[in-house]
């Protein structure tokens, strides 16, 4: 499996000065005039070898036993085992002609990495069902055991006699002889045990209720909080089946208000965060010999526990005239006991920070889903559906009596020696807010920003106290629109989607949008739209923020269904042509805004190395055999 040269080469090709040659006078690849300059992308892609071989095994086995089966009752049990196994070998080599070798003064670098990880899961289930007159009960109980393991070995060496040696003779590089070769190993393991039960009740198809409890324990947590209980419950009422709704039965086919509450636990992070771990800390001379030293690197926290997600949902489902279907939901989702590093007193703690459960975020909003048969029972049938959601996420809690923090800074700006962060979140504030300087115009070629007192100063006089919230990378609403049309044997599907109410930090404009970008390539706007601004980049400011709203035609598929003559082999045949990413309506000047990540705590930062979205055309054939 060829992994390619370097993931950042697309950005490098864009930013490289277009007047620079690919080769020098001697026929070798041209290298930049400084080690911080843009690397030669052709040299990086053609000369660097980055290969990998992966073995992936997915296996499952299950045994079922029917204990009781009658007209009114059923009882069965099952035992299942699954294995997910990955074995990865990676080999990397950069030759003596590469920019890395040129600027670091060695002849090539080779690296070999081996990784193996697997997850074993054993699950036992017992299912029971009872139907008596107007009552229907379904219950399930179970036990889960999960074992996960990961291990890694990495070794690298530099300065080889010949480039064609690559990684095949890793020990021949001079760095091993000089004691500068690198080697690293690591492994982790975790176990999870869970028991659970769930019961569903249905009375006359009028009242539906469900309740469940899951009790889980994980080795990842502190000794005092390894176990967690996660309950859930829901209830729904089918009003359309009530006697007083009979007169409206031709119109109202279903009207079901419902409410649900649930708690889930999160444990998908590193295995040893609750333990005091050790790492190497230099070498020390003992009895005439140098001995590698070890010291604590993380404080232990026996109180480290589960992150919990609490969800309340109130909604209603409806079906009208047997052709209009939909649902309306209000939701309140809270994530509690979120992990964060806080300042720890010394003593008693060895390190000055500790990972603890403190934070709480809250996501509230509404969701609307409607689809209907616009044309039904006619030559042309058309079904159309719209999904819309609106919501905001806030940081509700960041501190408690023991651990205090006034704000959290997230996503450090890339670059050497930088200390700026794109985001700041404080208690009561929205998640995903950009924090930086407010653009105030230009003067004598210098970008200006506002001070905390509203004055205008050059970026060179920027002070951290001038920063403010300048935008938000999280969309306030999402919209999707799906359409399906049928005419005789033809079918056509058209899908749109969009996001609204958010900003994107244009990293390409930040890096290449001003004339003062040095010897790098720059955007055309640097000499046209923004021609008056020569300097002032390098800081996070609203100048580089743009509205990210978009609405795009995501997919169009046209198909034709053939009806084969009676035969013993073929049941049906369908041919189709499909197109993806046909167009996007947006005011954003950077990459396709739909591929910019807008989820999580650090949304709305565009990537320099993201490839442009391509329009894809495909032709397909579907055959169904008897």
Residue ranges and their predicted role:
Residues 285-297, 334-358, 392-474, 482, ...:
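Surface-exposed, extracytoplasmic segments of Gram-negative outer-membrane nutrient-acquisition systems
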Residues 477:
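Metal-cofactor-binding active-site regions of metalloenzymes
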Residues 94-96:
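Membrane-interface helix-loop junction between the first two transmembrane segments
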Residues 102:
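The feature captures the catalytic groove of carbohydrate-active enzymes
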Residues 1-92, 105-418, 485-488, 545-626:
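Extracellular/periplasmic, surface-exposed regions of secreted and cell-surface proteins
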């Amino acid at each position: 499996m060829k992994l390619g040269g370097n993931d950042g080469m697309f950005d490098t090709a864009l930013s490289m000065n277009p007047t620079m040659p690919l080769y020098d006078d001697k026929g070798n690849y041209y290298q930049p005039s400084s080690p911080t300059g843009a690397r030669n992308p052709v040299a990086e892609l053609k000369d660097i070898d980055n290969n990998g071989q992966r073995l992936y095994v997915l296996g499952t086995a299950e045994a079922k036993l029917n204990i009781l089966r009658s007209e009114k009752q059923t009882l069965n049990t099952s035992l299942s085992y699954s294995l997910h196994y990955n074995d990865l070998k990676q080999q990397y080599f950069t030759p003596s002609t590469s920019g890395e070798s040129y600027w670091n003064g060695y002849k090539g670098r080779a690296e070999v990495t081996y990784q193996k990880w697997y997850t074993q899961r054993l699950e036992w289930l017992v299912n029971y069902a009872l139907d008596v007159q107007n009552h229907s009960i379904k219950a399930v109980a179970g036990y889960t055991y999960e074992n996960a393991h990961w291990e890694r070995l990495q070794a690298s060496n530099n300065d080889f006699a010949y480039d064609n040696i690559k990684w095949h003779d890793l020990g021949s590089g001079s760095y091993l002889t000089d004691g500068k070769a690198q080697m690293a190993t690591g492994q982790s393991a975790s176990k999870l045990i869970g028991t659970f039960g769930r019961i569903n009740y249905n009375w006359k198809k009028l009242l539906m209720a469900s309740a469940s409890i899951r009790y889980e324990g994980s080795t990842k947590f502190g000794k005092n909080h390894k176990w967690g209980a996660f309950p859930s419950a829901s209830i729904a009422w089918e009003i359309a089946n009530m006697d007083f709704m009979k007169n409206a039965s031709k119109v109202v086919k279903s009207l079901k208000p419902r409410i649900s509450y649930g708690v889930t636990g999160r444990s998908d992070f590193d295995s040893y965060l609750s333990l005091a771990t050790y790492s190497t800390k230099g070498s020390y001379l003992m009895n005439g010999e140098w001995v590698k030293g070890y010291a604590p690197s993380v404080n232990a926290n026996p109180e480290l526990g589960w992150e919990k997600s609490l969800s309340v949902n109130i909604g209603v489902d409806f079906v009208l005239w047997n052709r209009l279907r939909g649902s309306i939901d209000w939701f309140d989702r809270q994530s509690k006991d979120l992990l964060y590093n806080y300042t720890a007193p010394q003593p008693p703690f060895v390190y000055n920070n500790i990972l603890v459960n403190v934070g709480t975020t809250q996501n509230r909003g509404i969701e609307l889903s409607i689809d209907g048969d616009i044309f039904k029972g006619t030559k042309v049938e058309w079904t159309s559906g719209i999904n819309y959601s609106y919501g905001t996420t806030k940081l509700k809690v960041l501190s408690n009596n023991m651990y205090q923090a006034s704000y959290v800074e997230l996503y450090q700006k890339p670059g050497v020696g930088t200390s700026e962060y794109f985001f700041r979140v404080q208690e009561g504030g929205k998640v995903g807010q950009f924090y930086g300087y407010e653009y105030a115009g230009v003067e004598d070629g210098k970008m200006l920003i506002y001070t905390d007192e509203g004055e205008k100063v050059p970026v060179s006089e920027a002070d951290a106290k001038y920063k403010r919230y300048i935008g938000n990378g999280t969309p306030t609403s999402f919209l999707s629109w799906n359409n399906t049309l049928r005419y005789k044997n033809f079918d056509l599907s058209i899908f749109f989607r969009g996001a609204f109410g958010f900003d994107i930090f244009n990293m390409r404009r930040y890096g290449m949008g001003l004339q003062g970008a040095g010897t790098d390539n720059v955007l055309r706007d640097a000499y046209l739209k923004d021609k008056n601004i020569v300097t002032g980049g390098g800081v996070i400011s609203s100048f580089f923020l743009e509205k990210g709203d978009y609405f795009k035609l995501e997919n169009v598929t046209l198909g034709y269904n053939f009806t084969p003559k009676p035969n013993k082999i073929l049941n049906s045949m369908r041919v189709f042509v499909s197109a993806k990413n046909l167009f996007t309506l947006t005011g954003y000047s950077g990459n396709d805004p739909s591929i910019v990540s807008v989820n999580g705590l650090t949304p709305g930062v565009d990537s320099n190395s993201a490839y442009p979205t391509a329009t894809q055309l495909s032709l397909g054939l579907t055959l169904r055999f008897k």
